[in-house]
Amino acid sequence: MIKTIMSLFMALLTIVAITRAGPVRAEAKSDILAPALSLFLPGLDQWWEGEYRAAAAYTGIWVGGSSLAATAIDSLKRREVESGSEIGTDEGLASRDGDVRRAMLGGQMAFAAGSYSTLHAFQNAADSRRESGQYSFMGEQVTGKAAVLDTVAAPFRVSYLSRSSTYIPLGVIGALAAYSVKSKTPGYVNVALRDTDYAFGAGYSYLAGTHEEALFRGWMMPLIREYVAGDTTSNILQSLIFALAHRGSVDLPIPQLLLGYHLGYVTQRNGWTLGEAAFIHTWWDVIAFMAAYSKRESPAVLNLPPLSLVF
């Protein structure tokens, strides 16, 4: 779903950019095509620009993640053939099956590589266009490599917890998670968390929290801001797209819409840097995962009728 949305977004924005963009310097880099291609072929723009270390890193993560996912999917298929029944892949993120989790983690790694490569390409392109008057709203110039490194390191910066824009949303999700764990839900029972729950939840949350910020707030929102509308409108539009991209996992992504808007607001307030947003996003997901894994559907109970023997 998310790739379909991204393809439509890129097509529409390309049309808008062509019709509205003014003259740019000859050495200005592509802020739409190169980042877009790098999303689907991680490292492409970096190989082209001669940034070989970054290119190798993005391509390597992409290949490694894709291989992990493919191996896990093959294992799932073999097990299903041997058992003659489905493993339960429809549970998605709620599944505790090792192969299902490896498949999802590998897929997330591959997607993250594309988002990091996209941010890297876009940041360099935006900086190359500043002398033509574009992207002046983005604050001080940073290289694409620096932007990516800042984003992937952000979830470990606990200093963000001193900001009300960080501890309030995390406090809200924490309180809701605690209530969910302690309350009794019909059809569900509380279960102890396993080490694998912590490991998968943390790894998946880290990848989602960093690469989705790179994609939605690091590339999409400033593009909309430059070619379509101002700060508020660009934030609203990106948060709507962010929510729609999560329709595959939730029926009504209202929390994602609100979170996306807050993360966009924080990003704009911080000079269009992604650090605080990546911190909030990552730990929001960690808390949500741990709360979800603390409950499981009650096992089916077979109620047999009483046995009556009549002589």
Protein language model annotation of sequence segments:
Residues 36-81:
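N-terminal, post-signal-peptide region of Sec/Tat-exported proteins
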Residues 60-72, 81-88, 235, 239, ...:
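Short alpha-helical interface elements
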Residues 76-100, 186-191:
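Flexible, solvent-exposed loop segments that connect beta-strands
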